[in-house]
């Protein structure tokens, strides 16, 4: 039997639950720990206003570009990004930069399988923070079983949780696509990580970075994935599916090198005026049973 996750309905239900959450019981990214202020400053919070709540994540990949997933442009208008900030909202640290254009990957979901789930945000002015390194095109930065780190301001309990006030990170092992395809229907532009009980990306971590740490500090980190979709949060044997960043390089590199906005799939918001809290999933995913 196949179980399909219907994303739009789920995200709206979770948004409603979030509004009623007890603010005294706020949780953090599932099974993770606080990332010290001033570290991983390429990890970006996407916001509707400069000081408002972060509703999605992303990664600074050039001084004027943030890479995220299409869910983060669909359910809210990404008017601002917070770069170098430790907190889920406010303006007391980092910088808040205006987004002047959002564009989806030109081949996003062309076959209906959710492939190339990427969105690129162009900033009004350059960030003062250093971008994260992009992976090698030959995919040699990803090896099954290696450790990676996911980051964001999302929940640690599911389905009842609320955003973290401080950025969190959690260490996760990468799966081979062959193994992950025994759990989910995925495509070559995906990479899976996690699947250990109690440790995962979760609601409101959507679009956030999955990185490979090479041991020489943040300047040596490599962006290998972006939080996309999954089945629940932190369930044993159920990893999160990430957008595989190496698959986007042919599209991304010409844009960030020429500093031009390339014609792309139009971005349309599903919710006008106010945003909900996106569920982790970026595309309907099918679970194999």
Curated annotation (Swiss-Prot):
Name by which UniProt lists this protein: Glucanase inhibitor protein 2
Domain Peptidase S1: 29-257
Residues making up the signal peptide according to the UniProt record: 1-19
Gene name of the encoded protein: GIP2
PANTHER family associated with the record: FI18310P1-RELATED, POLYSERASE-RELATED
Source organism of the structure: Phytophthora sojae
Function per UniProt: Secreted effector that suppresses host plant glucan elicitor-mediated defense responses. Targets host endoglucanases and inhibits the endoglucanase-mediated release of elicitor-active glucan oligosaccharides from P.sojae cell walls.
A Pfam family matched in the record: Trypsin
Disulfide cross-links: 56-72, 180-192, 202-233
């Amino acid at each position: 039997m196949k179980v399909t996750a219907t994303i739009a309905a789920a995200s709206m239900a979770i948004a409603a639950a979030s509004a009623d959450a007890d603010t005294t019981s706020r949780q953090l990214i599932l099974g993770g720990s606080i990332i010290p202020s001033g570290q991983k400053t390429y990890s970006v919070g996407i916001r509707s206003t400069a000081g408002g709540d972060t509703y999605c994540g992303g990664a600074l990949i050039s001084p004027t570009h943030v890479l995220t997933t299409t869910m983060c442009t669909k359910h809210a208008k990404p008017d601002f990004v917070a770069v170098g900030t430790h907190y889920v909202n406010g303006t007391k640290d980092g910088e808040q930069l205006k987004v002047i254009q959002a564009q989806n990957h030109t081949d996003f979901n062309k076959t209906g399988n959710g492939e190339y789930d990427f969105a690129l945000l162009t900033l009004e002015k350059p960030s003062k923070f250093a971008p994260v390194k992009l992976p090698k095109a030959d995919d040699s930065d990803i090896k099954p079983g290696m450790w990676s780190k996911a980051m964001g301001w999302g929940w640690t309990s599911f389905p009842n949780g609320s955003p973290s006030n401080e950025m969190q990170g959690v260490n996760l092992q990468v799966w081979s696509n062959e193994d992950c395809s025994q759990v989910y229907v995925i495509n070559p532009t995906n990479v899976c990580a996690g699947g250990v009980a109690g440790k995962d990306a979760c609601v409101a971590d959507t679009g956030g970075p999955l990185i490979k740490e090479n041991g020489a500090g943040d300047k040596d980190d490599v962006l290998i994935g972006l939080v996309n979709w999954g089945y629940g949060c932190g369930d044993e044997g159920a990893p999160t599916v990430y957008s595989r960043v190496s698959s986007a390089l042919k599209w991304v590199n010409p844009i960030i090198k020429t500093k031009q906005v390339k014609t792309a799939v139009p971005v349309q918001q599903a919710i006008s005026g106010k945003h909900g809290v996106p569920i982790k999933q970026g595309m309907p995913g099918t679970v194999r049973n």
